[in-house]
Each structure stands twice: as C-alpha cells, then as structure tokens.
Amino acid sequence: MSRNRTLIAYATHGGTTEDYAKAIASVLTDEFKMQVDLVNLRKDHNPNLTPYRNVIIGTGIQKFRMYEEVAEFLEKTNFGDGKVVIFLSSLMPRDEVIKRYINVIIKKNPKLKPLAVEVLGGRMKVLGRTITDKTDIEKSEAWARKIAEQFHVS
C-alpha cells in the first residue's frame, strides 16, 4: 500500500460526478504529486483496494437515491486501514444529503468511517436539456486540497 497512491471510485449518470472526480484527480496529481487512479464503479463494481492508502468515493443523487453501484460499494466494502473520503453531487442542501444518504450508509457499514464528506453542486437534465446547473469545479478543487492535507497528515 503506497502512501501517495489514491483511488477515486465514482459513478456518474449525467457526467457531473465524473467531472468532479477528474478535477480532484488533477489537483492531487499536479499539486501534491500523488498517484491517482480513476475507476468508474458502473464498469468495475469491485475494484481491488489493496494498492491504495487513500480512497475517494464519488456519487450523484438521482430521483432521491444514491447511485446503486456506489451504495453497494460503500455498504459491502471493508476499507481496512485505508483513508476514505466521500463526495456527492446533488442539488439538495448539504445537511440533508448527509442525513439521508451518508448516515444511512454508515449504519449499514459501521466500519466505514470517512475522514471527510463533501456535497458539491449537481446538475439536472430533462430530456437531454440542462434545466438546473449548480456545478462548482472550483469548490471540488478546493476540497481536493483540503483532503490532500488530511491524507498526508493522518
């Protein structure tokens, strides 16, 4: 397990979560010289966590549900001693997202103890047209800097 090796495992439907995952990876790679691998959980449901010291998990919320691939991954995975952080892209308020989704997942997997959780703005499309867009790439980049410090310190 490498100290600087980080996995970003995510699921995306409309692309917002993937955009955030790539922005976070870019900050960690370019500014903190961390080795980062991206895995789309819709394609690889069970990535091997052995080589990773840090795991970042990203998901969106659609129809008031966390993406199924991520929910199952969080519920069933034993993260061992790895450092885990979670981000969600949503149009809902932060506290409501944490209460409705993160707290429920932690009850199902009490060993899951994320170092940090962030809610980033989401985007809503109807019939292929964006009707609401609260995407904030700069906020995801700032959060990446914050978690990089936590990864190095703890």
Region annotations inferred by a language model:
Residues 2-6, 19, 27-32, 37, ...:
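FMN-binding flavodoxin-like domain, especially the glycine-rich phosphate-binding loop
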Residues 7-11:
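Nucleotide-activated donor-dependent transferases that construct or modify glycoconjugates
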Residues 12-19:
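Glycine-rich NAD(P) Rossmann-fold beta1-alpha1 loop
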Residues 23:
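Active-site signature of alpha/beta-hydrolase-fold catalytic machinery across serine-
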Residues 39-45:
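Short acidic loop-to-helix transition motifs that present clustered carboxylates
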Residues 45-51:
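Short amphipathic alpha-helix with an adjacent loop that forms part of the alpha/beta core around
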